[in-house]
Design a protein with these regions (language model features):
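ATP-binding/phosphotransfer module of carbohydrate and carboxylate kinases, centering on a glycine-rich
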Residues: 1-5, 14-20, 37-45, 62-69, ...
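Short glycine-aspartate micro-motif
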Residues: 3-7, 48, 72-76, 82-84
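A cytosolic small-molecule/anion-sensing beta-strand core signal
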Residues: 10, 17, 51, 87-88
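A charged helix-plus-loop insertion that forms the helical arch/lid used to bind
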Residues: 19-31
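A short acidic/small-residue loop/turn micro-motif
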Residues: 29-30, 99-101
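Generic enzyme active-site microenvironment
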Residues: 50, 58
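Active-site glycine-centered loops adjacent to acidic/histidine catalytic or metal-binding residues
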Residues: 52, 78, 225
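Gly/Thr-rich phosphate-binding beta-strand-loop-beta motif of the actin/hexokinase/Hsp70
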Residues: 74-91, 118-121
């Protein structure tokens, strides 16, 4: 098949018109990086750039857990925290392109991303134990009943429920789709998170809203990025 272009789902926030990564909390060397220009000049093909959460949820809207639904809030739980709003299979970017950038919202002593992300769960465990280990190791310990790992996941769960409730009370979507690498540990936090989340939102919303894991799993971002070439 002929290659017609390259779609990219990048960490953000971005200036999509200029093709620049504006800021990156977890990868500071990418601040103001001209990604669009670099890729286009390297490959000589048209490039469409969007943030990774938007790309992932566009994929889910077209082929995954949001298929046949009209209003979607997507959350990505990876190294950082991302969110996306897709309505009628179109990404809602807002006036400046920053719609869904909930990661820097204030929470306790820092930002919500400091608590709700792969980095966040490691930070929470380190605060309790003074030991720095990976999220995968913390999940393993939690499944074995380790009290400190379970405490860290409990705080993560509370923070995630808060973050979802803030956003859902504003956007009122049909479905919340959650994806990203942290979802490999969803058996630890999912049921508790859903229960807490529904306490913090409007009763009418709680009665009808769906919460789903990403249906395309790790393929959602790739598929959504490719779709940018012909949907957007």
């Amino acid at each position: 098949a002929e290659l017609i272009g390259i779609g990219i789902g990048s960490t953000g926030p971005l200036d999509i018109n200029k093709g620049i990564i504006l800021e990156c909390n977890n990868l500071p060397t990418l601040h103001n990086y001209p990604l669009h220009k670099k890729i286009e000049s390297t490959f000589g093909l048209p490039v469409k750039l969007d943030n990774d959460a938007n790309a992932m949820m566009l994929g889910e809207a077209l082929w995954g857990a949001g298929r046949n639904l009209n209003s979607i809030l997507g959350i990505t739980l990876g190294t950082g925290l991302g969110a996306a709003i897709v309505v009628n299979r179109k990404i809602i970017r807002g006036a400046t392109g920053c719609a869904g950038e909930i990661w820097l919202s204030p929470y306790k002593e820092g930002m919500i991303e400091d608590y709700v992300s792969g980095t966040g769960i490691s930070n929470l465990y380190q605060r309790i134990t003074k030991r720095k280990i990976s999220g995968e190791e913390i999940s393993k310990l939690a499944r074995e009943g380790d009290i400190n790992a379970l405490k860290a996941w409990k705080e993560f769960t509370q923070a995630l429920a808060y973050a979802l409730s803030w956003t859902v009370n504003i956007v009122d979507p049909e479905v919340v789709i959650i994806g990203g690498s942290v979802m490999h540990s969803s058996d630890i936090f999912w049921d508790s998170m859903v229960s807490l989340f529904k306490k913090y939102i409007c009763p009418q919303t709680a009665a009808s809203i769906q919460l789903k894991p990403a249906g395309l799993k790790d393929n959602a971002g790739f598929m959504g990025a490719a779709a940018l070439m012909f949907v957007e």
